[in-house]
Amino acid sequence: MTEEQSTSVELPDFDVLADLLVEEGALTLSPAELHGMLAGQVAAGARFDPAGLLQRIQTLFDIEPFRNEAARRGAMQVYMAILQQFQAPDFSFELMLPDDDQPLSIRAESLGVWCSGFLSGFGMQEQTGSGGLSVEGQETLRDLAQIVQISTEADAEGDEDEANLMEVQEYVRMAALLIFSECNEPDAKAEAPASGEPPILH
């Protein structure tokens, strides 16, 4: 068992991490984008030690080195949770998004930001030995690119709107698992089930 898998790692609280990023001066970096970007990197095969992770975050987001130890720990916790959840046999990978009590429009926007981060992180990471994505994997990336544009009306809070967003969110979660499954060796991944067509959110 690897060090990453020896203990269970949970994602940090979204709002707490958001506040830490603001304190570091990363005013435009949201936890959703950070998580999506790192998930894309890991899905493409990247692995980091603590120093390398912090350096990669600074490079990817063009920010100054973290001054706060809590911010450094939070970033490492995000990475460790991503890696552990991707490798878990129960498909327990989670998206780092605002809590469900936030307005639907904010949650939808954050989902689009997450997808944008994932695509950027995946595209920046050189794929060595992955053999390329399958047709399904390539279609999944195109679907994520469409979901980047997701939006809802500011007053959209109905049950149908909520159900639609949750359906899209679940598709994105399973899409990330599929892409990780295709780009990583069998002993470093859990087999991800095939994903279906993404639903449309109005």
Predicted feature residues:
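Domain-length accessory/inserted modules outside core catalytic folds
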Residues: 1-115, 119-202
